[in-house]
Design a protein with these regions (language model features):
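Short, solvent-exposed secondary-structure boundary motifs
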Residues: 1-3, 31, 43, 70-71
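A short, exposed loop/beta-hairpin motif centered on an aromatic-Gly-Thr core
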Residues: 19-31
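Short acidic, gly/pro-rich beta-turn/loop elements at beta-sheet edges
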Residues: 17, 26, 62-64
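Short capping/connector residues at structural and topological boundaries
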Residues: 6, 28-31, 65
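Short aromatic-glycine-(Arg/Gly/Cys) micro-motifs in beta-strand/loop hairpins
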Residues: 1-22
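Short, mixed-charge low-complexity intrinsically disordered segments
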Residues: 45-70
């Protein structure tokens, strides 16, 4: 299964979302990106693949993929 986390600018900072649900809001883009990557790595450890997308203005600005190292 592929799990997707989105990092997007909000009025109050940067949010991390999964399936439309806000998992957290952070003051900086880098902090939000770090949190999203941690969520993705944890998901990948359990056999799923995960992707972190930075979304701005409705467009994907950056995308990073994480896969399980369990074979």
């Amino acid at each position: 299964m592929r799990i997707q986390f989105d990092v997007a600018a909000q009025e109050t900072g940067w949010s991390v979302r999964r399936q439309g649900k806000v998992l957290g809001t952070f003051a900086s883009r880098m902090t939000a990106l770090g949190a999203a990557e941690n969520f993705a790595r944890a998901s990948a450890r359990h056999g799923d693949s995960a992707v972190v997308r930075v979304v701005a203005g409705g467009e994907i600005q950056e995308e990073r993929s994480f896969a399980s190292d369990i074979f």
